[in-house]
């Protein structure tokens, strides 16, 4: 190909990529504006080849989580780099002791969390959860309970999952569940499992489908970890 033609082609590709980035940026901004728990005016959005970066500040950790979730569900988003800062208003600041006490109370009232299974440590508004549960949904419920509390600016979930059932047919069980779903073609997702640890490979059409595949795997009895290596096509 002549140098001039190659240069024109390269310029066209770059222009197309730039236009896609602008469209994706605008789509994410629109989705943030559509999310009632997020003040979109406080969040900056940039996009580069499907990777979206969020900056700015919010007043609660729950809003920060909601902003990231909103960005992930936009078509064309491959990954989200989240750099949002939580700036608590003075009237909702809480001491670490108050946050820990509130977290313990919230967990105790949640029917999805086994009694006395979770321990909470809070330092400078950042909560760390430890303990052991039998299911992923219990692990997620505990984190959800704590991230919505006043004064929390971050949550680290170190709760482990201890399988309580035989996991010998784990790959087959997950494969059957995926194949029952209208989201997936049986030939697009591969599953491997070793003693409760599951790895997903293959392709999905969107981050949402990729997430659904992981949630489906987590629903299988005995799963302790899911490595989601599904790529987007």
PLM regions and their residue ranges:
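N-terminal targeting leaders
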Residues: 1-233
